[in-house]
């Protein structure tokens, strides 16, 4: 239940008094000329919005984590006192008209597991908008993520056309694992700003997203075991790979990352000189139009580091390698039939 409604005459007044408001309050920011009004249910943007792009679209749940409280409302959240209702696996929300909206918020009180997680179901055509952290702690959007918080959350939602935002810079193990796998209507991916990764954080995240044409930037320079494992596997419409700036690799970091990306023609530049176990294992497997690779590795002795990594690429192409590297030819080395160009590696003295 709400305890109070706080009225502020300006956004600056709201910000000055924000920390002193009672919890579970509604705040209305009112400009003097009433041209602007904003309502905040305890925290600004403490919800995500699903908008029907097709009449009769539905949203439900296939699974609900035992740690997950999930609430929804079809009321206008930009007016005081929207009524929030509890969401469970027996609830199906029908958006009768194109443009109808439903708002979700939640709290995840414990770490999920690979058998205890929340998964949405959808029909029709639906766009998501807003900070996905609002599903895990709508009262504190910058709260640390829980393990497996987004595990399979929208997997198989072929009706999802736009993903919610994922602004977290501190991740948790498996946090976005298979989160959007088989979302075949997604064409773009949300930004992923984290620069330090944790194990399996992006594993299979967009696996099977066959309409995805644009990958997010991947600024991370500190990798983790299986962090990008099969991240874009089967993304057959992906035409440009993101840059991979990390220079130190870890086990299975890029394993299967672009497996089956048949529209890729150019691999991301691979600057690390020392490979790690399974780091490029099946990385570019089945990329049938791929015809350009620049890989500057000089130590390729790690276990299965390049096993089948270029199996099924274009029969002709260009491979740029370090001048002092020793590669074999074939599906686990330099593709047969490709032109090889050697390049000096610049040594930076500290």
What are these regions (language model features)?
Residues 1-350:
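Solvent-exposed loop and capping/linker segments of extracellular ligand-binding repeat ectodomains
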């Amino acid at each position: 239940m709400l305890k109070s409604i706080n009225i502020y005459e300006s956004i600056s007044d709201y910000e000055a008094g924000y920390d002193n408001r009672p919890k579970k309050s509604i705040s209305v920011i009112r400009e003097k000329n009433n041209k602007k009004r904003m309502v905040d249910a305890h925290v600004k943007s403490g919800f995500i919005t699903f908008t029907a792009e097709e009449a009769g679209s539905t949203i439900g749940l296939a699974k609900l984590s035992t740690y997950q409280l999930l609430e929804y409302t079809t009321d206008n959240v930009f007016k005081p006192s929207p009524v929030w209702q509890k969401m469970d696996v027996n609830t199906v929300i029908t958006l009768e008209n194109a443009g109808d909206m439903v708002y979700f918020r939640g709290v995840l009180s414990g770490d999920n597991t690979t058998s205890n997680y929340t998964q949405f179901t959808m029909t029709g055509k639906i766009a998501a908008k807003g900070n996905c952290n609002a599903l895990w702690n709508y009262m504190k959007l910058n709260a640390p993520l829980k393990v497996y918080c987004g595990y399979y959350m929208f997997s198989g939602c072929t009706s999802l056309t736009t993903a919610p935002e994922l602004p977290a810079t501190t991740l948790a193990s498996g946090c976005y694992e298979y989160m959007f796998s088989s979302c075949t209507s997604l064409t773009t991916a949300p930004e992923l700003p984290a620069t330090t990764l944790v194990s399996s954080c992006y594993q299979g995240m967009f696996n099977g997203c066959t309409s995805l044409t644009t990958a997010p930037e991947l600024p991370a320079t500190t990798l983790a075991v299986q962090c990008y494992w099969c991240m874009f596997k089967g993304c057959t419409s992906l035409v440009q790979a993101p840059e991979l700036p990390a220079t130190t690799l870890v086990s299975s970091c890029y394993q299967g990352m672009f497996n089956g990306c048949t529209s890729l023609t150019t691999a991301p530049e691979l600057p690390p000189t020392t490979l790690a176990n399974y780091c490029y294992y099946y990385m570019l497997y089945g990329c049938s139009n791929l015809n350009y690779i620049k890989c500057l590795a000089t130590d390729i002795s790690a276990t299965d580091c390049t096993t089948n990594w270029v199996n099924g690429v274009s029969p002709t192409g260009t491979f740029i390698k370090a001048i002092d590297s020793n590669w074999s030819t074939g599906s686990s080395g330099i593709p047969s039939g490709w032109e090889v160009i050697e390049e000096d590696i610049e040594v930076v003295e500290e």
